[in-house]
């Protein structure tokens, strides 16, 4: 995600065990975790948040559960499956993002009157064609036309330090070259060193792309010898949603939000730890008072 010669501000994140780590830390802090209790709606009393309505699915017969709370923090992620899967329209769960993230938090906030921003501007990511797994910047290679020409002017050979930023600048490139007949576009890793390819493979494991790694192993797809066709995936909602203030609070008093469902702050990994901590700390101090 960096131009050659400019500061590289993005870090690799080893998130393969993040759920285990976060759950362990939450339990250490004394957090009570309600599994199999998806929240259906938020509860407002006299214009302020008062709790949430959940559906208890822990038994054979579901039942509603009312959870009273002085403060509520929404961190339900992005909104996927609003559009058919670009690579496989008949398989909606073949999506680059978590198919369980369906915009529940954005909808719940909207239903109680929380201010929303940027919802009309969905985002499109990219990755291997048909096998929907995002993380194009994890690939250490350059983008090429079918005849071998470089797609962009930035680098002729990619390394783990400087990748090909072409499709960050020209984010519709994969679709454009199909539409104008010059495509498709391929990621070419054949010039990358064995050390960089090993680093790339490790990065894929860290970023949840293990299914892609397994598929390449099973099918004999070797990035050191084979180019991989890329495509632009279907639109989804990330970094669009509830508007928050500097403390992470929405326009509904007592309701906070962080992460992919926030509409006026950076989403993704850069956003949720920072504003998750800010919202959590602010909500806790406010509730204590």
What are these regions (language model features)?
Residues 58, 69-71, 75-81, 261-262:
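Glycine-/small-residue-rich beta->alpha transition segments that form the dinucleotide
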Residues 74-132, 269-282:
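Glycine-rich loop(s) and the adjacent beta-strand/alpha-helix scaffold that form part
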């Amino acid at each position: 995600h960096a131009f050659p010669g400019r500061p590289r501000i993005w870090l690799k994140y080893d998130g393969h065990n993040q759920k285990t780590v976060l759950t362990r830390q939450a339990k250490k802090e004394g957090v009570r975790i309600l599994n199999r209790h998806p929240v259906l709606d938020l509860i407002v009393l006299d214009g302020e948040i008062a709790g949430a309505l959940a559906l208890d699915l822990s038994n054979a017969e579901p039942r509603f559960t009312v959870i009273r709370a002085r403060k509520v923090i929404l961190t339900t992620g992005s909104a996927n499956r609003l559009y058919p899967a670009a690579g496989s329209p008949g398989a909606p769960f073949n999506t680059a993002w978590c198919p369980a993230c369906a915009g529940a938090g954005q909808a719940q906030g909207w239903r109680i009157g929380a201010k929303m921003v940027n919802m009309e501007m969905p985002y499109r990511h990219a990755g291997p064609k048909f096998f929907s797994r995002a993380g194009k910047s994890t690939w250490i290679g350059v983008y090429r036309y079918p005849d071998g020409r470089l797609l962009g002017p930035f680098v002729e050979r990619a390394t783990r330090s400087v990748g090909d930023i072409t499709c960050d600048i020209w984010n519709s490139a994969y679709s454009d070259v199909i539409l104008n007949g010059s495509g498709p576009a391929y990621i070419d890793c054949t010039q990358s060193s064995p050390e960089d390819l090993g680093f790339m493979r490790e990065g894929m494991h860290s970023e949840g792309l293990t299914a892609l790694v397994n598929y390449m192993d099973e099918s004999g797809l070797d990035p050191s010898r084979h180019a991989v066709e890329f495509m632009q995936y279907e639109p989804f909602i990330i970094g669009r949603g509830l508007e928050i203030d500097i403390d992470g609070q929405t326009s509904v008093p007592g309701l906070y939000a962080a992460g992919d469902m926030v509409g006026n702050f950076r989403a993704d990994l850069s956003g949720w730890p920072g504003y998750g901590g800010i919202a959590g700390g602010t909500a806790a101090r406010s509730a204590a008072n």
